[in-house]
Amino acid sequence: MKRSLILFAALAAVALPPGGGRPAGRPCLVLFTALAALVLPVGHGAFAWDYEGHRAVNQLALAALPQGFPAFIKTPAARERIAFLAGEPDRWRNQGDDLPLAHFNGPDHYLDLENLEDYGLTPEALPIFRYDFTAKLALPRAAHPEKFPPIDPARNKDHTRELIGLAPWAITEYCGKLKSGFSCLKAFQDYGGTPEEIANAQENIIYVMGVMGHYVGDCAQPLHVTKHHHGWVGDNPHGFATNSSFHAWIDGGFFRNTGGIKVGPLSGKIRPAKIVGDPTKPDDLFKQVMAYLLETHKQVEPLYQLEKEHKLSPENEKAGEGRALLEGQLVKGGQMLGDLWFSAWQQATEDKYLIRNLTERKAANTEKK
């Protein structure tokens, strides 16, 4: 892993001149493609958006929050913490030799939508529970193994190649965690929580907001909702790119070689956050999250078409079209994330168990006096 990172650092140093200037000519993209192929695995080992892209999504989401949103979220320290945590799930992926962690964390970053059909499933009729979904993947494989490509055990040490991704379940579950966090905070604030308890509850909320942003950001990256994640696979009538390094170029190579990501101007494209999901309908939030993935999926072919037309090459005078699509996806990710944060705050219910305990504690303390 360390050797790969060193080589990748060398790649960035060669591809981008000192000072972050414009690379000289098309060899930049060719060099990136050649070197990235040496270090990036085929499969879902690569990350969606580099750290700066994930930071941008979380920062854009913060721009969507209304004036009345809890003030502790808006302090400079909290905003930086939320932005930093955008990269946390990818840091977990850096522990390549920790197979239980890889098994748990890896599939939460993607969903290969086209592969649902292989299991007789459709995006509109997926179960809202992740283990119900994994069962629906396991049963056809067990009943008709001949219909599925064999899995190489040497490349499946973390036992994730039987899966096609769990990203929408991860997002929905994090929404529930955030609702719980707001419920706990309100209970501590209203029923005699100590300053330390209130501060810890606030820190829990900040943590969940930051980490969940990663998965929402992943699903704004078109290559994380398709089987064509590392180059086009199967029938290819349009002659789209098949090189596995395409993923890394979209994650961050393009932005690094075209001036980076400027969050300020993009923030102007963010509207105020709105409610997502009807809490009276248990499956509604999941359906809204799936709709978000399906919208992202609409950009898969346009993204490959831009590559085919060299509009994702820094030296092309029409590279602005490639930047527009990718920046648009960052904005969509930030918008969705802001909506989910806002919804969790608005829809948080009473934590009756905690309220009861706090009430009993307060009464006991009063009696002692």
Feature annotation, model-predicted:
Residues I6-L7, P18:
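Generic low-complexity, intrinsically disordered segments
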Residues P17-P18, L38-G45:
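C-terminal segment of classical bacterial N-terminal signal peptides
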Residues A9-A12, V30-P41:
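Bacterial N-terminal signal peptides
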Residues G20-P27:
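Short, low-complexity intrinsically disordered segments enriched in A/P/G/S/L with frequent Arg
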Residues G45-V211, P222-K369:
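N-terminal, motif-rich segments that launch catalysis or mediate targeting to/interaction with membranes
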